[in-house]
């Protein structure tokens, strides 16, 4: 699991085109968020059968990070471009859904962009010492 986290004052995306592994329906087709921790998340082959432990560690890190930066808004953004060893799309979709539920159970407001769609996106990264983080699980 590879994750690029950016603390953004503004983040937006809009679905443009589906890929062969696109989830249907693409919902929501677009989103705009303020003061959000945007998590570009890549599910890899090595993550298979480790989902529960990854979710536990991911949730703990996000709770810590959002507390440190004063943000409770999280955007999960599926992002295959962080790895050449992708896990199956079916498992990745399920993982992201489970992760969203686990984060919401901790009281965070969580949004997830559609899996398997090309998206245009724009962001303004806050630029403080914790605004950009990379994690591997």
Language-model features, listed with the residues they occupy:
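Short glycine-rich, basic-tinged beta-strand/loop micro-motifs
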Residues: 70-86
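Short glycine/threonine-rich loop-to-helix capping motif typified by GTGT followed
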Residues: 84-93, 124-128
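Conserved mixed alpha/beta catalytic, RNA-binding, or beta-rich assembly cores of soluble enzyme
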Residues: 9-68
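Alpha-helical scaffolding segments of alpha/beta enzyme cores, especially the outer helices
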Residues: 60, 64, 91-101
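Domain-level signal for soluble alpha/beta catalytic cores
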Residues: 3-6, 39-49, 110, 127-129
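Active-site-proximal loop/turn and secondary-structure-junction residues that shape catalytic pockets
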Residues: 10, 80-82, 114-119
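Charge-rich interaction surfaces and accessory domains that mediate macromolecular binding and assembly
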Residues: 4-9, 14-19, 127, 131-136
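Divalent-metal-activated hydrolytic enzyme cores
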Residues: 96-137
